[in-house]
Amino acid sequence: MPNIIRKLVENDKKELKKLNKMALQVESFADEMEHLTDEQLKAKTPELKERIAKGESLDDLLYEAFAVCREAARRVLGLYPFHVQIMGGIVLHNGDVPEMRTGEGKTLTATMPVYLNALSGKGVHVVTVNEYLATRDMTEMGELYSWLGLTVGLNLNSKSPEEKREAYNCDITYSTSAELGFDYLRDNMVTRAVDMVQKPLNYALVDEVDSILVDEARTPLIISGQAESSSALYYRADQFTKTLKGQNLNVATSDYEEGDDYKIDLQSKTISLTEEGIDKAEKFFQIENLYDMENVALTHFVDNALRANFIMLHDIDYMVDENQEVLIIDQFTGRTMPGRRYSDGLHQAIEAKEAVPIQDESKTMASITIQNYFRMYKKLSGMTGTAKTEEEEFREIYNIQITPIPTNRPVQRLDHPDLLYPTLEAKFKAVIDDIKRRHAEGQPILIGTVAVETSELISKKLVEAKIPHEVLNAKNHFREAQIIMNAGQQGAVTIATNMAGRGTDIKLGPGVIDHADPEFRGLAVIGTERHESRRIDNQLRGRSGRQGDPGVSQFYLSLEDELMKRFGSERVSAFLDRMRISGEDAVIKSGLITRQIESSQKRVEGNNYDSRKQVLQYDDVIREQREVIYAQRQEVILTKEDMTPVLMGMFKRTIDRQVDGHELAGNLKDEETVKDLLQTVQNTMLPEEAIELSELTGLSGQAMKDLIFDKVKSRYASQMEKLADPERQLEFQRAVILRVVDNNWSEHIDALDQMRQSVGLRGYAQNNPIVEYQEESYKMYNNMIGAIEFEVTRLMMKAQIQPQTAIRQEAPRMTTTASQENITNVGPDTSVSEEISFENVGRNDPCPCGSGKKFKNCHGRTHIA
């Protein structure tokens, strides 16, 4: 291991030496650029673009382009990138991540690679964690890019498709990661090329890259439609759960105590019923066996109710706003996530727990993981001050290297060892005493908490101590920038949950660095608990000591903190026993404790990485399917050629499947088998008068296929004759194909989503769930392709084509919307019209639509009460 570490350090040194040389090359242009007039400097942009058009690469232009942007920044922004910022910019251009400490000017660093890559005209996406930062950075840096002759756009959730398209067509586009991903999904749900907003993905530069590519990667981006409501079952399961005896996650000291109705695994945060709990469930729901196959749906509701009541914690995992809406709290930033909902019914279970209106369950219509979205960019890079702890993940998932960049000035912040107390009460008393001591000296203080309830508890204690302060948590995040901007003023006390205002610098006010005692100089950061991720702790520390300013950091811990309870070892418990003997106020400073905490954090980080990797592994299974379907959709939307050859292939394969299926089920020489085949053909492809039993009788399978195909070609030609105009024919072909593909694709990914839940249980049978998922999804994909071709054939053959005017009137209405929850209907139903009767059909009879499925498994799902 030491050899590996030594090698990594040597590689970093070698890379820094190379970057240093390149930065000096950029600086060698400084005098030349300084002597240019504004007009001459601005003229450099079209000149560089022309050189690219003539064949020079971006790498060829790097030194000069960086120097142009650097000089322009001095004239427009009054800021001149330092040597280390040039080094960081080169790393960004290379598609990697420079690790730059807080306050080292990452936003200014990004201007140089953004300018260089925007010269290609292929688009640069600057990605931020929220819309406030996207708007702020676009406004501030957009002034520089516009001065240099580049166009700058801002992509927000509230913008219309036209406004989004305009933003994406700019040289540089600012956006959040979620909005980029959702726009990609929406683009692959529209039915007309004019409704698409994104261009091909070229270069993304991600600010706070660890937050977006790591922390947010556990949650896939999903566009949903409404599914049927099951509110009564959620309330019933919640009523049952509230009768159970056991511990909540936040107070649990062990997984299980004798007599409990459920047990919690503290490390994995999972929950299950004990034998006592199962007995109670069977009595409550009046069933014989809770885990019988016929009760699978019920166990799903019970499992969610257990998680909602005993694992998901109010004001930590979620909060309820004034509109009685349950909002998820991002565990890494402390911000709420409006518009995002827990999947698989968990959100509805929390709504039942909190006795607020239950929103309908959703049906997945389109989804993608953050990882697979960003891996589609030709080049991906990002900036952060805390990425080294996740270096393996960046390398394995994104093929990105982390390069630590030296600070412009030496770090002067004093980082004190952690202080460990036996109880929460003793810890918070020590925290308040420290705040009083520092506040009396006029030192600005930032107090970091992990949960909203902790921030409110400290706030209450500060009110009692008559210390004025500000609270920044998920409940008042809208004042974030204003609160953080004032947090460096003399005497300011600010409590922040997790986020500590990432993206907004805390600038020190007058007199703050002048104190005689170094302990009271600069901003004091007080951590009230270690986060499960070392990066979040480092981000909190990094709020102090920016650009060589003095500062101090101190973490206060308790053996009753959640992290210690989840991963505390026997050796720590021995400390606890000794400390209780010596009194509640006893405090430990120990290297062993610090190492134990870091070891616990590494284990949690490892678990989280495994979780993100598993999300990606599942999404990788359908990635190829998604790319094929989306590519084919785009071909259909963009083509100006008649699609008859494509349709003929679908017709032929559908006929082959129908004949082969009947041949497998019986003998084609048998009259009953031929009659069944004839009925299927008449139901799905041809009018009754177009084909008769006598024509099929006695033919071989291949001869039957040829005969039916000839008649289908004839029927298709007569259908197209009703649309004499080739443009109308293409419009009709496109409408049918897109409607069928979209319906089947959304059904397919929703089925995959449900199947994923079930294959997880197969791990208990020593089967690899990922392998099972791969095999099942491949079969389901092939079935979906068959269903698409069958349905396209049926609609093309059986549709009652309406007059051209009807189609012409409907075309302008084929649009999608920017509102996530409204994306449900993307196909123009009115251009295809056919009545099929579903009356008096038995559950096990063949479906009248001709799919070959039983009625209960096809249209019977919606027609059987």
UniProtKB/Swiss-Prot annotation:
Localization recorded for this chain is: Cell membrane; Cytoplasm
A GO molecular-function annotation = metal ion binding
Which key words tag this protein in UniProt?
A: ATP-binding, Cell membrane, Cytoplasm, Membrane, Metal-binding, Nucleotide-binding, Protein transport, Translocase, Translocation, Transport, Zinc
List its EC numbers: 7.4.2.8
CDD domains in UniProt: DEXDc_SecA (cd17928), SF2_C_secA (cd18803)
Example GO CC term: the record gives: cell envelope Sec protein transport complex
* Cofactors required: Zn(2+)
Give the protein name, as stated in the record: Protein translocase subunit SecA
State the organism named in the record.
Lactococcus lactis subsp. cremoris (strain SK11)
